[in-house]
Amino acid sequence: MLELLQRLIATPSFSREEGATAEIIEDVLQEAGVKVKRYGNNVVAWGGDASKPVLLLNSHHDTVRPGAGWTHDPHLPVTNDGKLFGLGSNDAGGALVMMLAAFLHFHNRTDLPMSLCFAATAEEEVSGENGMAMLTRDVFVERPINVAIIGEPTGMQMAIAEKGLMVLDCVARGRTGHAARNEGVNALYASLIDIEWFRTHRFERTSPVLGNVKMTVTQIEAGSQHNVVPDSCRFVVDVRVTDAYTNMEVLEEIQRHVACEITPRSMRLAPSSIPMDHPLVLAGIEMGLTTYGSPTMSDQSLLPPDVPSMKIGPGDSARSHTPDEWLGVQELEDGIETFIRLLETMMRRMV
């Protein structure tokens, strides 16, 4: 699997440009005798007894574009002192090849209590319409999944909940006038009332894993020149939604309390979680793995509603999107071994 990861690093796969890495993954599966189907740049394979509930093993093969600060070619896989350097090594190449290794380990087994679906998805880094969203829309409607494991760098600990995201474009309205006269209605002042509400409001329900819904005003714009009272003030609010609410519930509560016009850019990046008493979580706890709530987004947010899910994978999220990104070779080897054992332990608990 190390060689496969090196091939993936060496093949550019920026979001919406993942065709070449999709072909590599497809070829590896076909060479192992697995029937594969492509949906755009998503690669999907099924294994086990098709009549049984479905466990989804998913990770993404797209990457961000490299930023400044790299000391070598981001697409040249270099191993030094036990570290494999290269773009996508940590996010999320290691988790992807871990998922693939586990799928190949189990895919011919029909005696397991669950069947398997392996999905290497595109456009994760941009939450695109042609990644996990496409599979949810076009594939998992026909063949529903029952539980999902998303491969991301978590240090092989279990991220059992993930916040959703809404970005709100807000507009406070006023009436223009000359700043030298007592006229007009200043939209900037009107916006301050709502901005203060966003700063201080606390939602009633708290997630035991993710804590409170978090709202942050991140941008503001008003006025055209110094002597004109602004008739509109635009501001942006970043809302991180916990699994204690749906995105719609949070939006409706906001709309009840503020006077500004609100336009959500998207409602589809939903919070996600898995119950603490799920066999998958209990299996991890039995093995000594820890649980936590993740502040970062993944393809979990685009899964079908009500599908329990968690994130796990080798590597460290802090290394993602950084110059000289790397993954420990031993991290990868240990991760594959741990993940296969996690699935075996979960399956045993379900029998």
What are these regions (language model features)?
Residues H61, E124, P153, A179, ...:
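Active-site metal-binding loops of divalent metal-dependent hydrolases
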